[in-house]
């Protein structure tokens, strides 16, 4: 996946996240909606991590295409 594709995916996920939150403003999310929101957040973390990996590899003179999506449990533990 190229940088522009990752950025587009990030934008789509952020829009989904905001739509879900806005549609329930002042209301509690159902268990299904909480799960959906959690999956969106996890996927966002993976996308940001992949984009950072690609940029770091490029800056170091390495092939950005060798960057790989890391498991959710790994990227969720990173400090932002």
Regions found by a protein language model. Give the residues of each.
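Extended, charge-rich alpha-helical interface modules
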Residues: 1-80
């Amino acid at each position: 996946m190229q940088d522009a594709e990752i950025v587009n995916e990030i934008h789509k996920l952020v829009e989904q996240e905001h739509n879900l939150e806005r549609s329930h403003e002042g209301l509690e999310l159902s268990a299904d909606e909480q799960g959906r929101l959690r999956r969106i957040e996890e996927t966002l973390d993976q996308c940001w991590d992949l984009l950072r990996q690609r940029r770091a590899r490029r800056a170091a003179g390495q092939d950005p295409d060798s960057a790989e999506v890391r498991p959710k449990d790994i990227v969720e533990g990173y400090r932002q």
